Amino acid sequence: MDPNMQNMMSSYLKIKKLVGDEGSDFEEEEEGEDEEEEEQERVVKVNFAESQLKKKKLNLGEGSGGKSGEKHTASGGGVVAQPCCLVENCGADLRNCKKYYQRHRVCEVHAKAPVVSVEGLMQRFCQQCSRFHDLSEFDQTKRSCRRRLAGHNERRRKSSLESHKEGRSPR
C-alpha cells in the first residue's frame, strides 16, 4: 500500500476511534458539565482531524471526479489521477518529472514545443500563463502570449521611466 494512503487510513481510523460507536445515542447521554465538556472537546478533535484528512486527500490529488485514466484508491473513497501530458497521443508519465510539469500536466518536450495538438486544436504552451493557447495568441516563435508579454514590457518601461526621473541611468 502507498505510504501516503497508509497514513490517511491510520488518520481515518483515529477519527473513527475518537467518534466511537456513539452515532445516534447523543440524546441518551447523562447531562453534566464534565461530560458536555468532554463531548465538546471530542467534537473539536474530530472536526480538526477531518479537516486535516481532507487537506491530505487534496494534496494527494484525490477529490471529486472520476475520469478515465485515474485509479481508485484501496479504500474506495477517492480517486488519484495519474499525472500524464495533456497533448494528444502523448500520454507521457509525469510521475518522475519535476513538480512544475506535473502541476501543469505537460511533459518537458511539449512545454517547449512550438506547436502541439490539444483537444483537436493547434496550440502552444505559454510559459507565463502555464496554459495552452491558440497559436494566434503568440508572436512568431515566442513562448509567452502577447497579453503577458505586453504586461511584462509595460512593467519594464515603467521601471525604466522611474529610474530616469530619479537621475539614474537605465538598466
Curated annotation (Swiss-Prot):
GO annotation terms (biological process): flower development
Subcellular location: Nucleus
Top-level taxon of origin: Eukaryota
A single MF term (Gene Ontology): zinc ion binding
Binding-site residues for Zn(2+) 2, renumbered to this chain: 126, 129, 133, 145
Basic and acidic residues bias (residue ranges): 159-171
Protein name from the UniProt record: Squamosa promoter-binding protein 2
Organism of provenance: Antirrhinum majus (Garden snapdragon)
